[in-house]
From Swiss-Prot:
Keyword vocabulary terms for this entry: ATP synthesis, Cell inner membrane, Cell membrane, CF(0), Hydrogen ion transport, Ion transport, Membrane, Transmembrane, Transmembrane helix, Transport
One Pfam family in the UniProt entry: ATP-synt_A
Biological role: Key component of the proton channel; it plays a direct role in the translocation of protons across the membrane.
Family recorded in the similarity comment: Belongs to the ATPase A chain family.
Membrane topology: Multi-pass membrane protein
Protein name (Swiss-Prot/TrEMBL): ATP synthase subunit a
UniProt-listed PANTHER family: ATP SYNTHASE SUBUNIT A
GO cellular component, as recorded: plasma membrane; proton-transporting ATP synthase complex
Compartment annotation: Cell inner membrane
Main location: membrane
UniProt xrefs under SUPFAM superfamilies: F1F0 ATP synthase subunit A
Organism: Acidiphilium cryptum (strain JF-5)
Recorded name of the encoding gene: atpB
Length: 251
């Protein structure tokens, strides 16, 4: 029905082949291209911002310093002093996801964080890292993480499987949360925009007046999507910090 009426809200998530290399042996999709672009933007912004550091920072340097302090404080507050060694990873993850979310808000760009394969890969990497950190700090003693302290022995056969399932579900919840929020926002955006165009093309002058409502909703939704882009990057980063905290401190 949606496609018959001219609205294809899911078409924006379709993967298309862009350019290739080595005689098409390696092909880049629009998702790959946006990920490369996000990496280039993050790197370029900080290279330009910090190339000529001044005592009184300019706009670019100020933005870079605010971003640095924001993530640095988040890492220290969540993980503690041990978190300093993981700051580069968390900061890169936060910046990459944030820019990826924002890129998807512009016409002709693609939100690669709207694909579960991408968010799943990021979540699995975080899960693997936090697990390795746990064994690195505690060795085989990390398995005690699944045995909550102070629990009666007779309850352990029930609680340990629950703890294991909860632990293994972390990458699922982490990836689905980011994927679902970005996808839902873009679908609503497309539906309102399509509805507005249908009113204008189908009702003429009356449709132009009627389209004011979906236009206003689309403008409000656009502002909300920029906020969601930041919040989802923050949530992914803060949960990464929490998982690393659990691995280091065993609670």
């Amino acid at each position: 029905m949606a496609q018959e009426s001219g609205i294809n809200a899911l078409g924006q998530f379709q993967l298309t082949t862009g350019f290739g290399a080595f005689g098409k042996a390696i092909e880049f999709t629009n998702s790959n291209e946006m990920m490369l672009l996000a990496a280039v933007i993050v790197t370029s912004l900080f290279v330009v911002a910090l190339r000529q550091r001044a005592l009184v920072p300019g706009r670019m340097q100020g933005l870079a310093e605010i971003s640095y302090e924001f993530v640095h404080n988040m890492v220290l507050d969540t993980i503690g002093e041990e978190g300093k060694r993981f700051f580069p990873f968390v900061f890169t993850l936060f910046a990459f996801i944030l820019i990826g979310n924002i890129l998807g808000l512009f016409p002709y760009f693609f939100a690669f964080t709207s694909h579960i394969a991408i968010t799943g890969a990021l979540a699995l990497f975080v899960f693997a890292l936090s697990t390795l950190v746990g064994f690195w700090y505690h060795g085989i003693g990390f398995l005690k993480f699944f045995s909550p302290p102070g629990v009666p022995g007779w309850l352990l056969p029930l609680l340990i499987p629950i703890e294991i399932v909860s632990f293994l579900s972390r990458p699922i919840s982490l990836s689905v949360r980011l994927f679902a929020n970005i996808t839902a926002g873009h679908v609503m955006w497309e539906v309102f925009a399509g509805f507005m165009l249908m009113l204008v093309s189908g009702l003429g002058a009356v449709g132009v007046v009627a389209a004011i409502i979906p236009l206003g909703l689309n403008i409000a939704l656009t502002a909300l999507e920029f906020l969601v882009a930041f919040l989802q990057a923050y949530v992914f980063a803060i949960l990464t910090c929490l998982y690393l905290h659990d691995a280091i401190h065993m609670h």
